Amino acid sequence: MFKVKFADIGEGLTEGTVAEVLVKVGDVVKEGQSLYFVETDKVNSEIPAPVAGKIAVINIKAGQEIKVGDVVMEIEDGSDTSATSEPKAETKSEAKVEVVEENASVVGATPVSNDVIVRKQTTTVNKSSTIKATPLARKVAADLNIDLSLVTPTGPNQRILVADIKNHQASSTQLASQPISQPAPTPSPSAHQTIAPTIKVVEPSAPLSWDEVPMNGVRKATVKAMTKSHTEIAAFTGMKNTDITETHKMRTELKDHAAASGIKLTYLAFIIKAVAKSLRDMPNINVRGDFANNKIQFMHNINIGIAVDTPNGLMVPVIKGADHLSVFEIAIKISELANKAKDGKLTRAEMTEATFTVSNFGSVGLDYATPIINSPESAILGVGTMSQTPLYINGELQKRFIMPLSMTCDHRIIDGADAGRFLIKVQDYLSKPVLLFM
């Protein structure tokens, strides 16, 4: 009998939460086949079987907290029944690791937008992208062409599991096979009639009551990161309206050309390129503080994090070496990383080592905000909603495209004057976007 223990999957974790058990007692499994899905404050991972055999004992269930070293299952593999073998060392490399976040929560839960939202613009939201489901459940639903919004979740935090997909399929098949009886006609309400919604009435004198939901790994990391940022960083925010009319014109001219090559050219791509070039011009913004040793670290790399809202929580994938990429290449990276984040396929390497973050809260209609620094970085740029504004240019009233920018900095190592100069530098690049291609 082989005892399967919950092992450290390579991130120094000590505990996790079982999101879904993928097998049942009596199942015959192959080596490497996924046994269960676990969430931690660092990663999501499907844990594979270290040996082949029949599932004899299952000691876990969805929603259960487990610690490293706990025996989660026992597999009949033909070995000595007294054996207490640990999972094979290869398990760490075989485990399919999917990053949830690393300090991503401190940016704020704003969805990534491939376009900066223009005021009064109407957007369509994909409902399935807002539904909580495990990556495996999403894959099964896609294979079976099942709409996730129609599936009843039974997992922790109202998350859809593979079992829910199968139950939905079974019930749909059963309903389809039943004869359809003609219902008795019911009078339709007149145009002046309204149907009152069902309202749960609570007596005013009733004591305060509430529902409790355990925090998942993403929320635990959010609590830790936001507490760290607000208690340790002396943050200040500077704001500036930026004229991006010329960037708007250039994007309009190049958009179809980029689309012909399969590239979605976005405002965000121009902004990230402008930020990267500005960081190269002003290395005193691209810094971290080693406060224990009273030193300032001037980062050699320019790696830009972008906030992405996903069904599993907020993630901040990183565009590494953004200063060496063209606007078109950055646009490709934005699409690739955003899609991988939403599909739960980001690697830890794609979620770490950011030196500066861009948060596009304009995608939810905000003009200004005070974005929270993603520690250990020292600054973050927030992008507001773009609007068309009449401005006097050389004595002539013109229609201009204005984008509000909000930049939060760690005042311990970045002075307010330098933050202002940086915003002006970004504005200069966006007002003369040809410089971004040089």
Swiss-Prot record:
| UniProt keyword annotation of RNA-binding present | no
In the record, N6-lipoyllysine modifications are located at: K42
Region annotation (Disordered) maps to 172-192
Q: List UniProt keywords, sorted A-Z.
A: Acyltransferase, Lipoyl, Transferase
Q: Show the ranges annotated as biased composition (Polar residues).
A: 172-181
Q: Which Pfam families does UniProt cross-reference here?
A: 2-oxoacid_dh, Biotin_lipoyl, E3_binding
Could you say which cofactors this protein requires? (R)-lipoate
Q: Which InterPro entries match?
A: 2-oxoA_DH_lipoyl-BS, 2-oxoacid_DH_actylTfrase, 2-oxoacid_DH_E2_comp, Biotin_lipoyl, CAT-like_dom_sf, E3-bd_dom_sf, PSBD, Single_hybrid_motif
Protein name, per record: Dihydrolipoyllysine-residue acetyltransferase component of pyruvate dehydrogenase complex
Q: Which residues form the Lipoyl-binding domain?
A: 1-76
Its Enzyme Commission number(s) read 2.3.1.12
State the organism of origin: Mycoplasma capricolum subsp. capricolum (strain California kid / ATCC 27343 / NCTC 10154)
Q: Which reaction does it catalyse?
A: N(6)-[(R)-dihydrolipoyl]-L-lysyl-[protein] + acetyl-CoA = N(6)-[(R)-S(8)-acetyldihydrolipoyl]-L-lysyl-[protein] + CoA
Q: Which family does this protein fall into?
A: Belongs to the 2-oxoacid dehydrogenase family.
Q: What are the recorded GO MF terms, alphabetically? A: dihydrolipoyllysine-residue acetyltransferase activity; lipoic acid binding
Question: How does the cofactor attach, per the note?
Answer: Binds 1 lipoyl cofactor covalently.
Residues in the active site? H411
